């Protein structure tokens, strides 16, 4: 595949146009709508799914459109001209500027960033419209947590409140089960003030670097909708800049709330710039990966100075959250010796190797307060990495894993002293009966800071299907209180995922996250389920497809056996056929009941009941003793 920057503007336009056509095909009956907040520049995007009317024979009524959360950015707005060479509109630029607490720098602060900018070998692959970076003014703190603690409701917080409510209205079916929330808060409406309170308390984060004005603000916390993250990134074995940008736009179209760029191959700096400039969602990274590349992959040669420069480099590009493995302490490393699979985290193994080589404490831990100073100058959130997570179910919940978790709790408090936002990463591989212990301990030692887990995988026997083995654990831990789920693709443990794998992983994790919202009893979570169930009962096939997470797949599976357009209005599917459709039979029962006298007006005697039963028995035999009759 060609490098993205080798494509002409016309090629890029044609590529986007084709992508847009594909999206219209796979998300039919959907319209991009914007809900305005208290000011004209707060325009919150949502996807509105139009529904057809209920057939006259089934009651005949209008079905209101269903509003759903949308992460696709302006890529799905037909009114916006997309130019990947220029990047996305700067949604937050005015909000950042009006706070008057940042400076625009003359040039990049990091040594490596300056080197790449001057390197003529990167000229052909470099993003052409790099803006000068921002940094907090001396003595200022620009984090959303700092604003929240001061009592400020920022435009980002108002935006999020509107977005979380999904504009659910009285005319949609709001019935739902109460759920069990394990101590979480279920409000009937999310307000900007509630968002502020949750961020101030550390129970939620708004990952929003001041150098990433393109993002549409979102929130991660257990009292909000469960979010999902998608991992992308190149490796030494392959992938190009255009492939990674394409994966990012593809992932956000299917519902990824955040993206992690885990690139470890060539041109990491340039790849990340292209992704950030074109991403409507927060971008996370693992800075130690790039720092390791700077020392040619020799972990022992890592230094605090190299890592610090990498943090500043990425913060000035606009990375919204960093995974930092500061909890991998020297004393925990020997605890992994008897594990079946040892240390499986790349970041964890890098820091463990450094600690053993120098027999010194992890420099990410000893320099943690200095890291906080960098984070609060750009509003980069911590994603405190679980470098000692279990890599198989045999190693689940051991002393090394939980020792690190307690250290992450300590570091959370230290970050909060700087008003830096924090979420905590979790496992991993954990059998079902041991999952809740992880959630309970995390809530206790990290004081309800958002939990962000990779699955967990509930069994190790299904390579090629680990998106399923992990989604089981993800749904459970999401119900218990995890705020964001890191997706797993079918390629997990096997290879670098392609676009199809990315889609499969996201759809699987959207199911897990939504199931968790239902189980928690999150207000409005059941609206889409109710609408789809009603469409199914009324044989509105197109509405069923359009309301599903993957309309294209649902429609194609239906059409494999019933391809004709007339089948879209048929009162049966190929599973049961026309005679044995339970939905159709139930409709017949309803019609029969409506034509009979009500119990209020009809009180038959015992003799009348017996006579009625005899009559129905005779009718059954007269009709050939068939359970279902032709209608």
UniProtKB/Swiss-Prot annotation:
Metabolic or biological pathway: Cofactor biosynthesis; thiamine diphosphate biosynthesis
Cofactor: [4Fe-4S] cluster
Binding positions for Zn(2+) per the UniProt entry: 429, 493
UniProt keyword terms in alphabetical order: 4Fe-4S, Iron, Iron-sulfur, Lyase, Metal-binding, S-adenosyl-L-methionine, Thiamine biosynthesis, Zinc
Organism domain of life: Bacteria
InterPro entries per record: ThiC (IPR037509), ThiC-associated_dom (IPR025747), ThiC/Bza_core_dom (IPR038521), ThiC/BzaA/B (IPR002817)
Pfam families xrefs: ThiC-associated, ThiC_Rad_SAM
Enzyme class: lyase
Subunit structure: Homodimer.
Name the UniProt record assigns to this protein: Phosphomethylpyrimidine synthase
Lineage of the species this protein comes from: Bacteria, Pseudomonadati, Pseudomonadota, Gammaproteobacteria, Moraxellales
Designated gene of the protein: thiC
């Amino acid at each position: 595949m060609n490098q993205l920057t080798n494509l002409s503007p016309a090629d890029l336009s044609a590529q986007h146009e084709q992508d847009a056509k594909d999206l219209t095909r796979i998300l039919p009956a959907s319209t991009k709508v914007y809900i305005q907040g208290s000011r004209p520049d707060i325009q919150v995007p949502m996807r509105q799914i139009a529904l057809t009317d209920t057939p006259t024979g089934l009651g005949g009524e209008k079905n209101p459109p269903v509003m759903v959360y949308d992460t696709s950015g302006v890529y799905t707005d037909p009114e916006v001209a997309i130019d990947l060479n220029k990047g996305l509109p700067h949604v937050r630029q005015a909000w950042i500027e009006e706070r008057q607490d940042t400076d625009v720098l003359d040039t990049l602060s990091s040594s490596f960033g300056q080197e790449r900018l001057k390197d003529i070998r990167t000229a052909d692959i470099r993003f052409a419209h790099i803006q000068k970076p921002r940094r907090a003014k001396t003595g200022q703190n620009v984090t959303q947590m700092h604003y929240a603690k001061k009592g400020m409701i920022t435009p980002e917080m108002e935006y999020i409140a509107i977005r979380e409510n999904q504009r659910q209205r009285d005319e949609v079916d709001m019935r739902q089960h109460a759920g069990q929330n394990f101590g979480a808060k279920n409000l009937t409406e999310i307000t900007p003030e509630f968002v502020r309170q949750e961020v101030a308390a550390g129970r939620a984060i708004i990952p929003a670097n001041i150098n990433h004005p393109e993002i549409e603000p979102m929130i991660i916390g257990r009292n909000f909708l469960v979010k999902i993250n998608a991992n992308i990134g190149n490796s030494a074995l392959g992938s190009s800049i255009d492939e990674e940008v394409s994966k990012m736009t593809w992932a956000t179209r299917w519902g990824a709330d955040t993206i992690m760029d885990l690139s470890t191959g060539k041109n990491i700096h340039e790849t990340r710039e292209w992704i950030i400039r074109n991403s409507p969602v927060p971008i996370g990274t693992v800075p130690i990966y790039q720092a390791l590349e700077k020392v040619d992959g020799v972990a022992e040669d890592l230094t605090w100075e190299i890592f610090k420069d990498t943090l500043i480099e990425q913060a000035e590009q606009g990375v919204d959250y960093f995974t930092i493995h500061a909890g991998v302490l020297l004393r925990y490393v020997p605890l992994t010796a008897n594990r079946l699979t040892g240390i499986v985290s790349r970041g964890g193994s890098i820091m463990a190797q450094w600690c053993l080589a120098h027999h010194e404490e992890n420099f990410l831990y000893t320099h943690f307060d200095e890291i906080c100073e960098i984070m609060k100058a750009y509003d980069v959130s911590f994603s405190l990495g679980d470098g000692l997570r279990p890599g198989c179910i045999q190693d689940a919940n051991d002393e090394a894993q939980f020792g690190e978790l307690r250290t992450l709790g300590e570091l959370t408090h230290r970050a909060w002293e700087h008003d830096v936002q924090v979420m905590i990463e979790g496992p991993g591989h954990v059998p079902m009966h041991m999952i809740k212990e992880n959630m309970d301990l995390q809530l206790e030692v990290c004081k309800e800071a958002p939990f962000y887990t990779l699955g967990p995988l509930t069994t190790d026997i299904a390579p090629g299907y680990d998106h399923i083995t992990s989604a089981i654990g993800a749904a459970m831990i999401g119900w218990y209180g995890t705020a964001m789920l890191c997706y797993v693709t079918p390629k997990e443990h096997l290879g670098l995922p392609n676009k199809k794998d990315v889609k499969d992983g996201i759809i699987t994790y959207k199911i897990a996250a939504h199931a968790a919202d239902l189980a928690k009893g999150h207000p409005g979570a059941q609206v889409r389920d109710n609408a789809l169930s009603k469409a199914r009962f009324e044989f509105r096939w197109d509405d069923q497809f359009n309301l599903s997470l993957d309309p294209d797949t649902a429609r194609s599976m239906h059409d494999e056996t019933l391809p004709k357009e007339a089948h879209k209005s048929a009162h049966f599917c190929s599973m049961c056929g026309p005679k044995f459709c339970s939905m159709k039979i139930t409709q017949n029962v309803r019609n029969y009941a409506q034509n009979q006298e009500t119990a209020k007006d009809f009180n038959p005697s015992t003799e009348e009941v017996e006579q009625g039963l005899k009559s129905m028995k005779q009718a059954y035999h007269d009709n050939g003793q068939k359970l279902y009759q032709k209608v």
